[in-house]
Protein backbone atom coordinates (compact mmCIF):
# COMPACT_ATOMS: atom_id res chain seq x y z
CA UNK A 1 0.00 0.00 0.00
CA UNK A 2 1.19 3.50 -0.81
CA UNK A 3 2.08 5.68 2.19
CA UNK A 4 2.03 9.39 2.88
CA UNK A 5 2.66 11.74 5.77
CA UNK A 6 0.65 14.70 7.04
CA UNK A 7 2.30 18.09 7.41
CA UNK A 8 0.54 20.83 9.37
CA UNK A 9 1.36 24.51 8.95
CA UNK A 10 0.16 27.29 11.24
CA UNK A 11 -0.33 30.53 9.32
CA UNK A 12 -1.13 33.81 11.06
CA UNK A 13 -2.94 36.66 9.33
CA UNK A 14 -4.46 39.78 10.93
CA UNK A 15 -7.51 39.51 8.66
CA UNK A 16 -8.52 36.26 10.34
CA UNK A 17 -11.25 36.71 12.97
CA UNK A 18 -11.58 33.08 14.00
CA UNK A 19 -9.36 30.11 13.30
CA UNK A 20 -10.01 28.18 10.08
CA UNK A 21 -8.66 24.86 8.81
CA UNK A 22 -7.81 23.70 5.31
CA UNK A 23 -6.75 20.40 3.80
CA UNK A 24 -4.60 20.79 0.68
CA UNK A 25 -4.20 18.06 -1.94
CA UNK A 26 -1.72 18.42 -4.78
CA UNK A 27 -0.37 16.07 -7.43
CA UNK A 28 -2.46 13.06 -6.53
CA UNK A 29 -1.86 11.68 -10.04
CA UNK A 30 -4.31 8.85 -9.43
CA UNK A 31 -2.52 7.47 -6.35
CA UNK A 32 -4.52 5.22 -4.06
CA UNK A 33 -3.95 4.95 -0.30
CA UNK A 34 -5.88 2.00 1.06
CA UNK A 35 -8.96 0.47 -0.49
CA UNK A 36 -10.98 3.18 -2.28
CA UNK A 37 -8.50 5.72 -0.84
CA UNK A 38 -9.95 5.10 2.63
CA UNK A 39 -6.66 5.84 4.39
CA UNK A 40 -6.47 9.28 2.80
CA UNK A 41 -10.17 9.95 3.39
CA UNK A 42 -9.92 9.00 7.06
CA UNK A 43 -7.04 11.41 7.68
CA UNK A 44 -8.95 14.27 6.09
CA UNK A 45 -12.19 13.46 7.89
CA UNK A 46 -10.40 13.24 11.25
CA UNK A 47 -8.87 16.67 10.71
CA UNK A 48 -12.32 18.10 9.85
CA UNK A 49 -11.21 21.02 7.66
CA UNK A 50 -13.49 23.95 6.87
CA UNK A 51 -12.66 23.47 3.18
CA UNK A 52 -10.52 21.38 0.87
CA UNK A 53 -8.20 23.08 -1.61
CA UNK A 54 -6.87 21.24 -4.66
CA UNK A 55 -3.66 22.65 -6.13
CA UNK A 56 -3.85 20.73 -9.40
CA UNK A 57 -2.77 17.48 -11.08
CA UNK A 58 -5.26 15.13 -9.50
CA UNK A 59 -4.93 13.08 -12.70
CA UNK A 60 -2.35 11.89 -15.24
CA UNK A 61 -3.08 13.22 -18.70
CA UNK A 62 -2.31 9.99 -20.59
CA UNK A 63 -3.94 7.63 -18.09
CA UNK A 64 -7.74 7.89 -18.11
CA UNK A 65 -8.01 5.45 -15.18
CA UNK A 66 -6.74 8.25 -12.93
CA UNK A 67 -9.92 10.20 -13.70
CA UNK A 68 -11.97 7.50 -12.01
CA UNK A 69 -9.65 7.37 -9.00
CA UNK A 70 -9.85 11.13 -8.51
CA UNK A 71 -13.59 11.18 -9.20
CA UNK A 72 -14.39 8.65 -6.46
CA UNK A 73 -12.19 10.43 -3.92
CA UNK A 74 -13.47 13.92 -4.65
CA UNK A 75 -17.13 12.92 -4.81
CA UNK A 76 -16.79 11.41 -1.34
CA UNK A 77 -15.06 14.51 0.02
CA UNK A 78 -17.65 16.81 -1.53
CA UNK A 79 -20.38 15.17 0.57
CA UNK A 80 -18.89 16.71 3.72
CA UNK A 81 -16.67 19.64 2.73
CA UNK A 82 -16.55 22.58 0.32
CA UNK A 83 -13.99 21.67 -2.36
CA UNK A 84 -12.13 24.16 -4.58
CA UNK A 85 -10.25 22.76 -7.58
CA UNK A 86 -7.55 24.66 -9.50
CA UNK A 87 -5.98 23.36 -12.69
CA UNK A 88 -2.59 21.72 -12.94
CA UNK A 89 -0.80 21.20 -16.23
CA UNK A 90 -2.28 17.69 -16.53
CA UNK A 91 -5.86 18.99 -16.33
CA UNK A 92 -5.05 21.81 -18.76
CA UNK A 93 -3.54 19.38 -21.27
CA UNK A 94 -6.32 16.84 -20.87
CA UNK A 95 -9.12 19.29 -21.67
CA UNK A 96 -7.36 20.71 -24.75
CA UNK A 97 -9.35 20.25 -27.98
CA UNK A 98 -6.83 17.92 -29.56
CA UNK A 99 -6.32 15.64 -26.53
CA UNK A 100 -7.25 11.98 -26.95
CA UNK A 101 -9.01 11.86 -23.57
CA UNK A 102 -10.70 15.26 -23.72
CA UNK A 103 -14.24 13.87 -23.63
CA UNK A 104 -13.43 11.68 -20.64
CA UNK A 105 -11.98 14.68 -18.82
CA UNK A 106 -15.00 16.86 -19.59
CA UNK A 107 -17.33 14.16 -18.25
CA UNK A 108 -15.22 13.95 -15.09
CA UNK A 109 -15.34 17.71 -14.62
CA UNK A 110 -19.08 17.89 -15.28
CA UNK A 111 -19.86 15.22 -12.69
CA UNK A 112 -17.66 16.87 -10.06
CA UNK A 113 -19.37 20.20 -10.69
CA UNK A 114 -22.74 18.50 -10.19
CA UNK A 115 -21.48 17.29 -6.81
CA UNK A 116 -20.77 20.90 -5.83
CA UNK A 117 -17.03 21.08 -6.45
CA UNK A 118 -15.94 24.55 -7.51
CA UNK A 119 -13.57 24.51 -10.51
CA UNK A 120 -11.42 27.62 -10.82
CA UNK A 121 -9.70 28.21 -14.17
CA UNK A 122 -8.52 31.81 -13.88
CA UNK A 123 -11.62 32.37 -11.79
CA UNK A 124 -12.37 33.28 -8.20
CA UNK A 125 -15.00 32.38 -5.66
CA UNK A 126 -16.07 34.32 -2.58
CA UNK A 127 -16.85 32.20 0.45
CA UNK A 128 -17.34 32.70 4.19
CA UNK A 129 -15.60 30.10 6.35
CA UNK A 130 -15.78 30.14 10.15
CA UNK A 131 -16.95 33.74 9.97
CA UNK A 132 -14.05 34.85 7.75
CA UNK A 133 -14.47 36.33 4.26
CA UNK A 134 -12.25 34.53 1.74
CA UNK A 135 -11.71 34.79 -1.98
CA UNK A 136 -10.33 31.55 -3.44
CA UNK A 137 -8.48 32.30 -6.69
CA UNK A 138 -7.55 29.50 -9.09
CA UNK A 139 -4.76 30.29 -11.56
CA UNK A 140 -4.58 28.34 -14.82
CA UNK A 141 -1.33 29.12 -16.61
CA UNK A 142 -1.02 28.67 -20.39
CA UNK A 143 0.99 25.56 -21.14
CA UNK A 144 4.06 27.47 -22.35
CA UNK A 145 4.67 28.36 -18.70
CA UNK A 146 5.40 24.67 -18.10
CA UNK A 147 7.86 24.19 -20.96
CA UNK A 148 11.10 22.32 -20.21
CA UNK A 149 13.67 23.61 -19.47
CA UNK A 150 12.83 27.16 -20.55
CA UNK A 151 9.52 28.91 -20.02
CA UNK A 152 8.57 32.59 -20.29
CA UNK A 153 8.69 35.02 -17.40
CA UNK A 154 5.34 35.53 -15.69
CA UNK A 155 5.04 39.29 -15.40
CA UNK A 156 2.80 41.11 -12.96
CA UNK A 157 0.88 42.44 -15.96
CA UNK A 158 0.22 38.93 -17.27
CA UNK A 159 -0.78 37.79 -13.81
CA UNK A 160 -3.38 40.56 -13.55
CA UNK A 161 -4.58 39.78 -17.08
CA UNK A 162 -5.23 36.19 -16.00
CA UNK A 163 -6.55 36.76 -12.47
CA UNK A 164 -7.48 40.40 -12.05
CA UNK A 165 -6.54 41.93 -8.70
CA UNK A 166 -6.95 40.46 -5.22
CA UNK A 167 -9.81 41.67 -3.06
CA UNK A 168 -8.42 44.09 -0.42
CA UNK A 169 -11.39 43.44 1.89
CA UNK A 170 -11.02 39.65 1.96
CA UNK A 171 -8.45 36.99 2.76
CA UNK A 172 -7.11 35.98 -0.66
CA UNK A 173 -6.05 32.40 -1.32
CA UNK A 174 -4.24 31.72 -4.60
CA UNK A 175 -4.16 28.16 -5.92
CA UNK A 176 -1.26 28.26 -8.37
CA UNK A 177 0.03 24.85 -9.42
CA UNK A 178 3.46 25.89 -10.72
CA UNK A 179 5.68 27.30 -7.92
CA UNK A 180 8.31 28.55 -10.37
CA UNK A 181 6.57 31.93 -10.38
CA UNK A 182 6.46 32.41 -6.62
CA UNK A 183 7.93 35.91 -6.81
CA UNK A 184 5.10 37.02 -9.09
CA UNK A 185 2.49 35.41 -6.84
CA UNK A 186 3.85 37.30 -3.82
CA UNK A 187 3.83 40.57 -5.75
CA UNK A 188 0.24 39.92 -6.83
CA UNK A 189 -0.74 40.07 -3.18
CA UNK A 190 -2.38 36.80 -2.12
CA UNK A 191 -2.41 36.20 1.62
CA UNK A 192 -1.91 32.46 1.14
CA UNK A 193 -0.40 30.84 -1.97
CA UNK A 194 -0.66 27.08 -2.51
CA UNK A 195 1.39 25.22 -5.12
CA UNK A 196 2.71 21.77 -5.98
CA UNK A 197 4.07 20.47 -9.32
CA UNK A 198 7.69 19.84 -8.26
CA UNK A 199 6.96 16.65 -6.27
CA UNK A 200 9.38 17.85 -3.60
CA UNK A 201 12.29 18.01 -6.04
CA UNK A 202 12.55 14.18 -6.32
CA UNK A 203 15.53 14.11 -3.90
CA UNK A 204 14.71 16.27 -0.89
CA UNK A 205 17.54 17.64 1.21
CA UNK A 206 15.64 19.68 3.79
CA UNK A 207 12.36 21.44 4.55
CA UNK A 208 12.79 23.83 1.60
CA UNK A 209 15.44 22.27 -0.64
CA UNK A 210 14.91 19.70 -3.38
CA UNK A 211 17.25 18.59 -6.15
CA UNK A 212 15.36 19.42 -9.33
CA UNK A 213 12.09 20.85 -10.58
CA UNK A 214 9.67 19.32 -13.07
CA UNK A 215 11.16 21.71 -15.64
CA UNK A 216 14.70 20.41 -14.97
CA UNK A 217 15.80 23.46 -12.97
CA UNK A 218 18.34 22.37 -10.31
CA UNK A 219 17.62 23.46 -6.73
CA UNK A 220 14.55 25.56 -7.58
CA UNK A 221 13.82 28.45 -5.21
CA UNK A 222 10.27 27.52 -4.23
CA UNK A 223 10.62 23.75 -4.23
CA UNK A 224 8.83 22.54 -1.11
CA UNK A 225 7.77 23.76 2.29
CA UNK A 226 6.68 27.18 3.52
CA UNK A 227 7.92 30.62 2.48
CA UNK A 228 7.09 34.07 3.83
CA UNK A 229 7.33 37.59 2.47
CA UNK A 230 5.77 40.85 3.69
CA UNK A 231 3.21 39.06 5.82
CA UNK A 232 2.19 36.69 3.00
CA UNK A 233 2.70 32.91 3.00
CA UNK A 234 3.40 30.42 0.22
CA UNK A 235 3.21 26.67 0.84
CA UNK A 236 4.49 24.21 -1.76
CA UNK A 237 3.33 20.63 -1.35
CA UNK A 238 5.62 17.73 -2.18
CA UNK A 239 2.51 16.05 -3.55
CA UNK A 240 0.61 12.83 -2.99
CA UNK A 241 1.78 11.04 -6.11
CA UNK A 242 3.99 11.06 -9.16
CA UNK A 243 3.93 9.89 -12.76
CA UNK A 244 6.27 8.60 -15.48
CA UNK A 245 9.27 8.20 -13.13
CA UNK A 246 7.92 7.21 -9.67
CA UNK A 247 11.08 8.18 -7.80
CA UNK A 248 11.29 9.83 -4.37
CA UNK A 249 14.36 9.95 -2.12
CA UNK A 250 14.04 11.32 1.45
CA UNK A 251 10.88 12.84 0.05
CA UNK A 252 7.65 11.28 1.33
CA UNK A 253 4.30 11.95 -0.28
CA UNK A 254 2.37 14.44 1.80
CA UNK A 255 -1.08 15.65 2.70
CA UNK A 256 -1.04 19.28 3.85
CA UNK A 257 -3.11 20.70 6.67
CA UNK A 258 -3.21 24.44 7.32
CA UNK A 259 -4.46 26.24 10.40
CA UNK A 260 -5.01 29.95 9.76
CA UNK A 261 -5.16 32.03 12.93
CA UNK A 262 -5.22 35.74 13.87
Language model regions located:
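N-terminal membrane-anchoring alpha-helices
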Residues: 1-16
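Conserved catalytic scaffold of divalent metal-dependent phosphoesterases
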Residues: 15, 28-30, 91-192, 223-262
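Short extracytoplasmic
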Residues: 16-41
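Residue-level marker for buried hydrophobic side chains located in beta-strands
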Residues: 21-24, 52-54, 85, 174, ...
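Active-site glycine-centered loops adjacent to acidic/histidine catalytic or metal-binding residues
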Residues: 27, 56-57, 88, 177, ...
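Core catalytic region of metal-dependent phosphoesterases/phosphodiesterases
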Residues: 36-128
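Short hydrophobic/aromatic-enriched beta-strand-loop microsegments
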Residues: 191-199
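Short, surface-exposed loop/helix-turn segments at secondary-structure junctions
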Residues: 205-220
